[in-house]
Amino acid sequence: MKKAHIISHTHWDREWYLPYEKHHMLYIEMMDTLIDTMEKDQEYKCFHLDGQTIMLEDYLQVRPENRARLQKLIEDGRIAIGPWYVLQDEFLTSSESNVRNLQMGYKLAQEFGGKWTKIGYFPDSFGNMGQAPQLLKKAGIDTAVFGRGV
């Protein structure tokens, strides 16, 4: 018998079919609900925050008073963050941009206790850069998840 894992997560486009401000407020509501739910329900083990750490800044821009609550869930391994700063279309950006994106994601993860997801997360790229394995290996990441464009 094969084992399947269901991972609770969001895929978060900061702006897509709605203006940034509308998406931002929907995100704030989602995070408020997530934090409340995780604090009340210890059986809710983990939530994957879409591989991007900028979401932490976006949330705390509106709810700075919740930093300690959010950080505790991250430190406890219940909210998985990173490794990226933003979830880019890595095929359309330069190699240098992808390196800097990973460095910025790592730096922000350090500010939240240093736990970051060691998964090269590419759920929504329209192709993958040839340097992805090299970049991930240099970052100590040996697993990748990718979606469309392959």
Residue map of PLM features:
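Carbohydrate-active enzymes and regulators
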Residues: M1-V150
